[in-house]
Amino acid sequence: MGECIVLAENLTRRFGEFTAVDHVSFEIHAGEIVGYLGPNGSGKTTTIRMLLGLLEPTEGRATVLGFDAFRQTEEVRTRSGYMSQKFALYDDLTVYENLAFYAGIYGVRSKSQILETLNRVGLSGTEQEITRG
């Protein structure tokens, strides 16, 4: 088995009284091919978003490629790739955070470029609004 490249220990995420992810722990080692399966609403996307530093866990810790997923988010994101099964806005992120996330997939990290894009499409001033999907 190769080195551990993803480590999740007791990852938990609650939204109010609802527990979306409940103390999930696993390891992924270099060279492994992994399928992360489960029914709709089982917490798969929430877990992936925590591993990418897009969503902070209520409890637990995770490392990706040796970086703390919650304290070294930029290092994790620049070394990771993620594509959603279908395009959708994340309803708990702001307009800016949603655009920055998808822009980052394509290597665009410039805040000024993202803000200019918002201005160009008439969304200037909405950067901090939650999208609500």
Where in the sequence are the language-model features?
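Walker A (P-loop) phosphate-binding loop of ABC-type ATPase nucleotide-binding domains
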Residues: 39-43
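Short hydrophobic beta-strand immediately N-terminal to the Walker A/P-loop
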Residues: 34-36, 48
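Conserved ABC ATPase "signature" region
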Residues: 100, 104, 111-127
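Helix-to-loop junction immediately C-terminal to a conserved catalytic motif
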Residues: 52
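Conserved ABC transporter NBD signature motif
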Residues: 60-68, 75-80
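Short coil-to-beta microelement around the adenine-binding A-loop and adjacent beta1/P-loop entry
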Residues: 18-19, 74
